[in-house]
Amino acid sequence: MEEMVTIPRSEYEGLKSENAQLHATNQKLRDEIALMKGGRDSRTSSTSPSHDICRSNRNSLRVPSGKKSGGQPGHTGHHLQMSDTPEQVIDHTPEVCTDCGKNLEDVPCGSYTRRQEIDVPPILPVYTEHRSHTKICPSCGMENRGVYPCRIAAPIQYGPVVEATAAYLSVYQYLPYKRIVQLFKDCFGLCLSEGSIDSFLNRLSNKATSIYGNIRELIQCAPVVGSDETGCRVNGKKHWFHVWQNRWLTFIVAFAHRSYEVVENCFPGGFVHSFYVSDCYAAQLKTPAKAHQLCLAHLLRELLRFEKHLRSKWSIKMKALLCQALELKEQMTDDDYLNPPTKVIEINNRLDELLAVDFSKFNRKEQALVKRLIKNRDSILTFLAYKNVPPDNNGSERAIRNIKVKTKVSGQFRNSDGKGADRYAKIRSVIDTKIKNGQDVYAALLCLAEG
């Protein structure tokens, strides 16, 4: 029979305390492992969906609206309309009687029904020859020669429609050069080279310089501006696309880095007349502005991660508070921004209470979030004080998504002069701005090519 060992109370208390510390450390490490293994994905952080390890069973921040799928009551539908002036009419007349077999060729036609088919005719290249004629002045004998249009600068060259179409396919439809070459050959019977397409984009971006500059000036004095950035590769090296946008304008620029120097270079003095919406990246928060608004979509994804993997009560409460603020935003009237209702005051008070908690025992990453929110407390609920300030930066993320799709489809920007990303940024800025203002993209590119 084993003999019971007696230890002093002081030693027992020490072992008990050490055991409790080990349990706490063990739980903390388990929480961190859970975060590192499956915590960061496109739903719970700003990580892109392509980096998700497991893409099944996706959860969304959206909640059911209660509406049925499809068109909603009051929605104006669209369907094919017959033309009153068809370009071609084909008559189908009966030749013999289907009952007795009598020949009906000489019988006049009576009533008829009609059906229409819409198609696109084959597109073939059209060669236009420009001739510069000479005339001798009968008065002084001077030989005068006709002047070619400014854009006709070579013995033979491609026209503006070819240039605009290539730019449309490359920048707006994301196609790589090789596919554009194949499309022109198969659909138009025109054999382009990849070098020709690169030259088209170079000329078009040069012509877009003045519009690009105007967009930058308008963005800097806009009442609300959102900003974001994303990585890309240019000739094998890491670069960054930065975007500044609002409801009417989009300005994109490519840089070799993502520091605050980019903001200083593009927008000296910052946005002192604008409400600035962004994520919590330091260079964005450092940008001078009338007031900042943190992207709540980013914050909600982080809180969802802590709720899902840590079962954090604090994160659940903060997430519920931000969702309540978003619901209140949709219900507020113009007068509510002049005289804040009680609910706005209550939400601000509850936010202060949540940020005043003792977070020393929180998970390390959750602590970092709390500290970040405390530091930027005045930038969390700006949207409840000003009508035109959005609560998220989704507009900037939509602008960035076009760039990510381009790099996914076409790969990196590879140009001998290293300016491919700059050309894309210019032309895409013009395209996105035209779209936001309800203008035809192809017509705008054609106008640039003809200029």
Region spans (language model):
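Catalytic center-proximal scaffold of phosphoryl-transfer enzymes
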Residues: 2, 6, 13, 20, ...
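Short, flexible loop/hinge motifs at secondary-structure junctions
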Residues: 1-154, 198, 227, 233
